[in-house]
């Protein structure tokens, strides 16, 4: 469990695209750990996991991207924000010492999720890439496919029931898409990541249709940390789904937008369940680290 004690610490972090400045970070539990810093900004061939699972919800504005670093230092990137966030994504990865991504997941073809993946694939060493079986005729999607081809990679199909061999200490299981549909959001890859007694549910833009399919599949949806679906849209995070997940903490990847994200409906549901909410628009990048028994939550800003 996270202790209730909150304290301030200061770490060096990138002001992406402008240089480096000192920013305040808020930290709950344990001791401070390194985030983006001037000391670890150089490209390295290996990331140090330090025995912790690190799930980093990168602040990419109105988009989504999560960087996972396993206890043994293996890396996974889920989505990479919009097209205009390509350079920021590269700065983030550099700041975390990542030059190789063992796994890349493109949750679905929407530009605010896969827009930066082409540049990431062009620049970094890539192990495997998974995407759902759905096509798009957008320039963003075609650019991603071209980068994949140039790298000589083969896309593996992301679907419910698939388990990924990433780190022997961490279970990574895909819970969606359960069935094929023409709707991009409801073809989103949903993954549950479990390390010891701790668990994370990463939902992409999955909406009510996908949530219902997961519930009906009988999958174990319970997780301590929930990435709120579709940036907090009222089309996602249904009451029934939230009751099944029973999260203690939730992260909403959202920026300035005209969609009304996150919606009051979803925020009220989370509040009713007494879920502690972290938001990229308020807190900046959010890192949740687990030692298998508890969590450490670090935010770029106090919110």
Show the residue positions of the predicted features:
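Non-globular, low-confidence helical/coil segments that flank catalytic cores
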Residues: 2-303
